[in-house]
Amino acid sequence: MKSKKQARAACPCGGGELAACCGRYLGPDASPAPTAQALMRSRYSAYALGLEDYLLATWHPSTRPEALHLDEDAGVVKWIGLEVKRCEAGSERDAEGVVEFVARCKVGGKAERMHETSRFLREDGRWYYVSGLVA
């Protein structure tokens, strides 16, 4: 059972409390993210929390790497903010979606930004990350 402090922890994506935001998609028995944007936000949160299993499970099999090695980034990369710039399609009724975002982080204490346009596919009621174009 989670403590009150854990239940009220802020979601890394900036969408409110973790439990009410991305936390509802991150567990092994959790519901799938209903939209491409919700999946993108939950994947950002998973990166921030070091949840490699979730990231791999939500990566489309056609482009999924074997591993991400997030443990190598632990203590070096700190994710500090997310801004969604644009969404195209990606609703519960769509089969494809695009989400453009800017993710801010610190790498070894130095501030950096990653501006990406990500492509998502929905198959069998689940959204998957397919690929991203970094600007």
From Swiss-Prot:
<comment type="similarity">
    <text>Belongs to the UPF0225 family.</text>
</comment>
<dbReference type="InterPro" id="IPR048469">
    <property type="entry name" value="YchJ-like_M"/>
</dbReference>
<dbReference type="InterPro" id="IPR032710">
    <property type="entry name" value="NTF2-like_dom_sf"/>
</dbReference>
<dbReference type="Pfam" id="PF17775">
    <property type="entry name" value="YchJ_M-like"/>
</dbReference>
<protein>
    <recommendedName>
        <fullName>UPF0225 protein CV_3559</fullName>
    </recommendedName>
</protein>
<dbReference type="InterPro" id="IPR023006">
    <property type="entry name" value="UPF0225"/>
</dbReference>
